[in-house]
Design a protein with these regions (language model features):
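Acidic, turn/loop-rich segments in luminal/extracellular domains of secretory-pathway
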Residues: 1-3, 7, 13-23, 27-37, ...
Length: 209
């Protein structure tokens, strides 16, 4: 009687230490001695979010150190990679340790293209946050139309961008640098840490009729 041999998982280590935000964990290979069709996947208590795509162990969206999703929230994920040929299943346990990486602050929900009606002073609210929870502040840092704007602060991390002119901008008579009604502004967010990591965002503010 012919014996069906199990699939063989190769080139997959038993442990990995990776920086956060990485989605592609490891590439490996699977062969079947009888060339049977294989089902390859991931199981285990920490397997939510993991998948195998073309023999790549993958985590959807990248592993986040600040918001671990492993079962005991310690940033150590233990999963089982399996290969099943319909007769036999081969498995390999893999432990993945996630390391913290300093991350720059973020402008929350702010798009680089902003639209504001003419004669309206407040252009857009601003909210900034640091992924690690450090203090953060923001301000106007540049842009050819910088002189036409100011900040209105609620606190260090929240506020608004506004025209200096209380009447806002005139659609019919734009006063931006090239008179096209699209105002160019640059805003900067910076962490209150020794590293002072920063994020700079270029804004295009279009005044509408």
């Amino acid at each position: 009687m012919e014996v069906n041999n199990p699939p063989v998982i190769s080139d997959l280590l038993t442990s990995y230490t990776l920086d956060e935000n990485i989605a592609e964990i490891a590439t490996f290979s699977v062969t079947d001695p009888e060339s049977n069709q294989l089902t390859i996947g991931v199981s285990g208590d920490d397997s939510a979010g993991f998948s195998v795509v073309s023999n790549l162990l993958y985590f959807e969206g990248g592993l986040n150190y600040e918001s671990p999703s492993d079962s005991n929230a310690d940033n150590v994920y233990t999963v089982t990679v399996f290969a099943d040929d319909g007769f036999n299943r081969s498995t390999q346990d893999v432990e993945i340790t996630v390391s913290d990486v300093p991350e720059s602050p973020e402008f929350v929900g702010l798009d680089s293209n902003v639209f504001v009606e003419e004669n309206v002073r407040i252009v857009t609210p601003i909210s900034v946050a640091d992924p690690e929870g450090s203090g953060v502040s923001w301000g106007i840092s540049g842009g050819v139309d910088k002189a036409l704007f100011r900040t209105l602060s609620v606190d260090a991390a929240n506020g608004s961008i506004a025209f200096i002119d209380f009447d806002g901008a005139d659609y019919e008579e734009p006063n931006d640098a090239n008179s096209d009604g699209v105002y160019e502004l640059q805003v900067r967010a910076v962490e209150d840490t020794p590293e002072a990591l920063e994020t700079i965002l270029d804004l295009l503010i279009t005044v509408t009729d």
